[in-house]
A protein has these predicted regions:
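Conserved beta-strand segments of alpha/beta enzyme cores
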Residues: 26, 48, 91, 116, ...
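Short, basic/aromatic-enriched C-terminal tail that caps enzymatic domains
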Residues: 268-294
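Helical "substrate-binding/catalytic lid" subdomain
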Residues: 168-271
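NAD(P)+-binding Rossmann beta1-loop-alpha1 motif at the extreme N-terminus of oxidoreductases
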Residues: 1-58
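Rossmann-fold dinucleotide-binding core
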Residues: 4, 98-177
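Rossmann-like NAD(P)-binding element
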Residues: 47-86, 90-93, 98
């Protein structure tokens, strides 16, 4: 049985925590800065809610960071502040969609206080952790974290310099985030020509694998598009670091920027056709919006 502090219990964090609970581990979280809804979700999931971040860390051997990409560095700094000087700090596992440069920066922050960091990428469904997921880990304690998840999911180790798991995550995300953005462009063009239903039907007939992915992922975007935009920014940071232009990624991010700015209902349970119709009707990708998104 391992004590694990979960930072924080959002959609994927809750799924990871529940899966670890089912394997007999103890999951802690500190929710002093979170909403009542988050606290209820954590308590209903069986997590132990601590009064402070420091208390949760003090009870744990492993800390899992699952936050929006833009918060990952600050979470690492906050963790480092709490464990500095401790004789034995938890292993810090960054499970966020961040670029390898950001992962390396986090690795340095954690190493500077004498703790160990693991770079981790989680692939597959975000609302449950099981056989459909794959986890990639990288770092000096990668095997320890691989053992933690081995009975839950398929685990792979990315060898080489720290940030290898994030490199795999970002490379995969170029496709998994850019494909929905490209599909929106395709469907807006077909909708403007009065052929949306036929085009989508043909896609389903001729490219069922792609259509299955689009049908599963794109309807979640009104709720999660801000995070997807952050992820695309992280990819652009990485591509620039590699000396690549990132032109396709940049263009896909612009489409997602527009979708975010359209502010389609995040609470509605969208089906694919309804979402595509709304994007077309709102002129989300209209030419007159050119220049409105940097």
């Amino acid at each position: 049985m391992t004590g694990i502090v979960l930072i924080s219990p959002g959609l994927m964090g809750t799924a990871v925590g529940r899966a670890l609970l089912c394997r007999g581990h103890v999951v802690y979280c500190a929710l002093s800065r979170r909403s009542d809804a988050t606290r209820r979700r954590a308590e209903q999931s069986g997590f132990i809610c601590c009064d402070s971040f420091g208390e949760a860390i003090g009870k744990s051997e492993i800390a899992l960071s699952l936050v929006p990409p833009g918060q990952a560095l600050n979470v690492a700094r906050r963790f480092a502040d709490h464990v500095a000087g401790l004789p034995a700090a938890p292993i810090f596992v960054d499970c966020n969609s961040i670029s390898p440069p950001t992962a390396r920066a986090i690795g340095r922050i954690i190493a500077d206080v004498g703790a160990a960091a693991v770079d981790c990428g989680i692939f597959g469904p975000a609302d449950k952790i099981g056989p459909e997921n794959v986890i990639v880990v990288n770092g000096s304690e990668a095997r320890a974290i691989a053992s933690l998840f081995a009975d839950l999911v398929e685990v792979k180790i990315a060898h080489g310099a720290f940030g290898g798991a994030s490199a795999v995550k970002m490379a995969m995300s170029i496709i998994t985030k850019a494909l929905p953005a490209l599909f929106l462009e395709s469907t807006c063009a077909s909708a403007a020509s009065g052929q949306l239903d036929l085009m989508v039907g043909l896609f389903d007939r001729l490219y069922p694998g792609i259509m299955s992915f689009i049908s599963r992922s794109l309807p979640t975007y009104p709720r999660h598009v801000a995070r997807r935009v952050d992820e695309m920014h992280e990819i652009e940071i990485w591509l620039r670091d590699l000396g690549l232009s990132g032109a396709m990624t940049h263009s896909a991010r612009q489409n997602l920027d527009r979708l975010r700015d359209a502010e389609l209902s995040a609470e509605r349970k969208w089906d694919l056709i309804a979402l595509l119709d709304a994007v077309a009707r709102h002129g989300v990708l209209a030419a007159e919006r050119e220049g409105a998104v940097a």
